[in-house]
Amino acid sequence: YYYYEDANDIWFSFEKGGISISGLSFKIKGEFEKGERIYFIQKGKFLISLFSTISQFKYLLKSLLLGIDYINKKGIIHSDIKPENILIEHKGDSNENNFKITSIKIIDYGSAFNVNNTTAISSNTPEYLCPEITTGNKKFIKELKNNNSRYINCIDIWSLGITILELCLCCPIWMNYKTKIIINGKTYHSTGLFGCRGREANKIYQKQVELCKGINKKLKNSMLYLFDQYDRENFIDLLKKMLELDYKKRISCQDAVNHPFFSD
């Protein structure tokens, strides 16, 4: 098991089939600095090994794309892809050059819905939802139902993009408190990418718009420093396509799998 402690509670999590990516990647600890309470994020060995071993990073992302595509083609939209709902088993670490992911599972289908029943769409975790669901875009929902093969990946591939971006930035996107992060030996203070009090949809949407206008800037201080220039540029290009604000232009899972980032 692993646990998370905040000002009021201690949360224990027990998981079978692996540990969630969030549990492996971050440990969050509240502390006082100059009289102010901030949260310090400690990176897990898994996260460091993942970005230090490009072949395993590609394997993880490609496997998740294929898994989502498989689910979607069955007419099911997961609609709650996030770090807590991806379980990982692995062995070794980058220091010994034997890091390997052995199992990947997408869990928690409590928010999933059939593409022919769009009335079942929920927004349990709005920070990871795509803009068209965040804003309640009725045109998209109608097109999804009537022409589902074209737009069937739109919801889940956005959520996957945000999940991977969260790992890059080393900070849960929902954090709305001041957070201290250390990347490549440098200390940064920030908040989560979509963190806002009340988790209001319109505020999250505005942050989504800001993100899409400046992904390169957001990734300036990130774990991507561990990638070589070729992989870094190709990955950012793929991520931009996954996080395209216009759902009609957003990349499909199959096209993402065929992106140059995955070519050896």
Where are these regions (language model features)?
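Short beta-strand micro-motifs within the conserved protein kinase catalytic domain, predominantly
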Residues: Y1-I10
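Terminal C-lobe "cap" of eukaryotic-type protein kinase domains
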Residues: E244-K249, C253-D264
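Conserved C-terminal C-lobe helix
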Residues: Y230-L243
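Activation segment/activation loop of eukaryotic-type protein kinase catalytic domains
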Residues: E89-P131, G136
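Catalytic-loop of the protein kinase fold
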Residues: N72-E89
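Structural motif in protein kinase domains
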Residues: G17-K45
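Activation segment signature within eukaryotic-like protein kinase domains
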Residues: L60-L61
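Conserved C-lobe activation region of Hanks-type protein kinase-like domains
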Residues: T134-W158, I162-L224
